[in-house]
Amino acid sequence: MWRRQVGALLLRHRSTPSSTLRHHLPLPVPDQSPPLASNLLLRLFTSQSGEGGDGATKPFIAFVLGGPGSGKGTQCVRIASDFGFAHLSAGDLLRSEISTGREKGELILNIIKEGKIVPSEITVELIRKAMESSDAKRVLIDGFPRCEENRIAFERITGTEPDLVIFFDCPEDEMVKRLLGRNQGRVDDNIETIKKRLKVFESLNIPVVDYYTSRGKVHKINATGTEEEIFGAVHKLFSSLRF
């Protein structure tokens, strides 16, 4: 399943994305019929995928989940640095594809501008190709899967499951406080928007956490406290693993 005849994708998008794209990539909603542009995009990705495999060893895959403001992105950077992981973000990969100006990127941008959802298959293909082109033996996938539809698509397309799922468990009031601390705009509007994001996260992402908990793959990290305190727990966990 781990084909190498694919175009290289940037693991970390280095150009400055627009604030609109960074903050308004739509959340996945299950059972939404894909538009015509999505169908064309699926065909483009499928037609350019390599066929067959070369027997490459599957990397150690860790999903990193947590609500907005839980600090998972910050912790991922430190995990990647200290333990030799490639750090992949689905949002960054979509933005990177858009920034190329190629046909696939333009189609993704049009879907987002229309307020529609980029199909799970597209996001998974970007992740799969990034894993293959990185040649990394250990991969962190940050903030994905965001819903059960994402999870099912990942397992179907890659033919594998994650080896580990890290869930940064953070109380809602703490996440709200952190997110408000990042913003300088109208506080009332920010609170309303943040609480909506948290409700969407709970309804879509928690079932994924529950599923992998039933598979014995989830390690919960208490995401309250300082960055150093949280990383202390993270470091202890990763130091105990055998890759």
Curated annotation (Swiss-Prot):
Residues binding CMP, per UniProt: N150
Annotated region (LID), positions in chain: 181-189
Binding of a ribonucleoside 5'-phosphate, residues: R95, K116, I117, V118, G143, F144, P145, R146, R186, R197
Reactions mediated catalytically: UMP + ATP = UDP + ADP; CMP + ATP = CDP + ADP; dCMP + ATP = dCDP + ADP
Ranges where the record places region NMP: 89-118
Main subcellular location of this protein, as a coarse class: cytoplasm
Alphabetically ordered keywords of this record: ATP-binding, Cytoplasm, Kinase, Nucleotide-binding, Nucleus, Pyrimidine biosynthesis, Transferase
Gene Ontology cellular component annotations, sorted alphabetically: cytoplasm; nucleus
Coiled coil regions in record: none
Entries under InterPro entries matching the protein: Adenylat/UMP-CMP_kin (IPR000850), Adenylat_kinase_CS (IPR033690), P-loop_NTPase (IPR027417), UMP_CMP_kinase (IPR006266)
Record-level GO BP terms: 'de novo' pyrimidine nucleobase biosynthetic process; CDP biosynthetic process; UDP biosynthetic process
NCBIfam families for this protein: UMP_CMP_kin_fam
Known role: Catalyzes the phosphorylation of pyrimidine nucleoside monophosphates at the expense of ATP. Plays an important role in de novo pyrimidine nucleotide biosynthesis. Has preference for UMP and CMP as phosphate acceptors.
Protein family (similarity comment): Belongs to the adenylate kinase family. UMP-CMP kinase subfamily.
Domain statement: Consists of three domains, a large central CORE domain and two small peripheral domains, NMPbind and LID, which undergo movements during catalysis. The LID domain closes over the site of phosphoryl transfer upon ATP binding. Assembling and dissambling the active center during each catalytic cycle provides an effective means to prevent ATP hydrolysis.
Subunit field text: Monomer.
Protein's name according to its UniProt entry: UMP-CMP kinase 2
Originating organism: Oryza sativa subsp. japonica (Rice)
Lineage of source species: Eukaryota, Viridiplantae, Streptophyta, Embryophyta, Tracheophyta
